């Protein structure tokens, strides 16, 4: 079976993925899979999805040659896929529009979501307003504090934001609560999962909705440089922006795919969120993948300066691509990401999300090892307005 043909009918990417949930959710997931299969074969559904991406989101997003950044770093030419220019400021909206159209197709009037950085919460609240649905967003209490502007945005858009105070009070705990809500209200509620993780069919359908990123790049790069890039770099938390740009490139064997995890305070410190670098396979949130866990299988608390990467698992397709050797995964620590954030601000006039700054930081390491006529394509997954407070605090500045 080719890498691009996965998952199999049971949602497996080799040993990863699958469905590990309570009986209550099995029927809901099966109904979702059946509805999604039908939607994919329905030209009307796909046409509406594409219409919304063009006229509501503002796609295609441009690919931009970061000339001054390339000069500063030396070596390869750096190009940025500008997902930060989408409506709501990140790649998340590609997926929430697709899932909201599915929810409407299934007759669901209430949607729920989990969020870390708040971008998926904002994108979910946005599409709920767009299609006239009730929206509840679960968010770790620590992230509510870190991402106050996005919390207010969600409320402006009509969503109810529920702070989650259990565990580490971050994305993992928000996801737990969202799944509890779904079990309780499965008849009326559609769960808009924010990343390419969770039980089947979510990793597949989120990837499919995000693949617009990579498909656009494959069309755009020859116009800009006459060929495809030598390397594609994207940050990986759950991994939806990365799989969205990686997946269409999988058959292009001479294109390196590099996923960048949150190295936090350094992998050796144990305070990080890099399961592909330092984790082991296990089951969490309904799927099997590389996880941050101890020898007893208990989830270890994660750390990252970036709320959106602060997750102890990763999408199952990334785990499979790692094992298959088709993609490579590297950690970038907080300080490196913050430095890259400032670089992009100063040299290109672009304020990136801290998540995306991890990918820029990897380009900073990679570019000098390559020739001047080689090309790195960085997925700039979101803009950094939401992170201004965090960046100021890291610099000892009070806003």
UniProtKB/Swiss-Prot annotation:
One of its GO terms (cellular component) is cytoplasm. InterPro entries: Trp_synth_b_CS, Trp_synth_beta, Trp_synth_beta/beta-like, TrpB-like_PALP, TrpB-like_PALP_sf. CDD domains: Trp-synth_B. Its EC number is 4.2.1.20. The modification N6-(pyridoxal phosphate)lysine is found at residue 92. The beta subunit is responsible for the synthesis of L-tryptophan from indole and L-serine. PANTHER family: TRYPTOPHAN SYNTHASE, TRYPTOPHAN SYNTHASE-RELATED. Belongs to the TrpB family. This is Tryptophan synthase beta chain. The lineage of its organism: Bacteria, Pseudomonadati, Pseudomonadota, Betaproteobacteria, Nitrosomonadales.
């Amino acid at each position: 079976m080719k890498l691009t043909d996965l998952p199999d009918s049971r949602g497996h990417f080799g040993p990863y993925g699958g469905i590990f949930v309570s009986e209550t959710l099995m029927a809901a997931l099966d109904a979702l899979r059946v509805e999604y299969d039908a939607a994919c074969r329905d030209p009307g559904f796909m046409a509406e999805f594409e219409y919304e991406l063009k006229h509501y989101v503002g796609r295609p997003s441009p690919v931009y040659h970061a000339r001054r950044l390339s000069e500063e770093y030396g070596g390869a030419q750096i190009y940025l896929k500008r997902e930060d220019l989408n409506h709501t400021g990140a790649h998340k909206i590609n997926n929430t529009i697709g899932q909201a159209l599915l929810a409407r197709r299934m007759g669901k009037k209430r949607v729920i979501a989990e969020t870390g950085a708040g971008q998926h919460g904002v994108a979910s609240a946005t599409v709920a307003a767009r299609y006239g649905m009730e929206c509840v967003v679960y968010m770790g209490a620590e992230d509510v504090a870190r991402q106050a502007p996005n919390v207010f945005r969600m409320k402006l858009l009509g969503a109810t934001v529920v702070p989650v105070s259990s565990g580490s009070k971050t994305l993992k705990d928000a996801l737990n609560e969202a799944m509890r809500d779904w079990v309780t209200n499965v008849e009326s509620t559609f769960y808009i999962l924010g990343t390419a993780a969770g039980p089947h069919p979510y990793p597949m359908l989120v990837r499919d909705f995000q693949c617009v990123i990579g498909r656009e790049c494959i069309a755009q790069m020859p116009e800009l440089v006459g060929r495809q890039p030598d390397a594609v770099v994207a940050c990986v938390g759950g991994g939806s922006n990365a799989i969205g740009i990686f997946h269409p490139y999988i058959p292009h064997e001479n294109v390196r795919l590099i996923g960048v995890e949150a190295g936090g305070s350094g992998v050796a410190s144990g305070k990080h969120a890099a399961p592909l670098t330092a984790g082991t396979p296990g089951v969490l949130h309904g799927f099997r993948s590389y996880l941050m866990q101890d020898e007893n299988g208990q989830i270890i608390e994660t750390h990252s300066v970036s709320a959106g990467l602060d997750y102890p698992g990763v999408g199952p397709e990334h785990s499979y691509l790692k094992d298959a050797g088709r993609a490579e995964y590297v950690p970038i620590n907080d300080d490196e990401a913050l430095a890259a954030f400032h670089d992009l601000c100063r040299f290109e006039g672009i304020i990136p999300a801290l998540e995306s700054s991890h990918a820029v930081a990897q380009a900073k390491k990679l570019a000098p090892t390559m020739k001047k006529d080689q090309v790195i394509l960085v997925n700039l997954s979101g803009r950094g307005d939401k992170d201004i407070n965090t960046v100021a605090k890291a610099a000892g500045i009070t806003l």
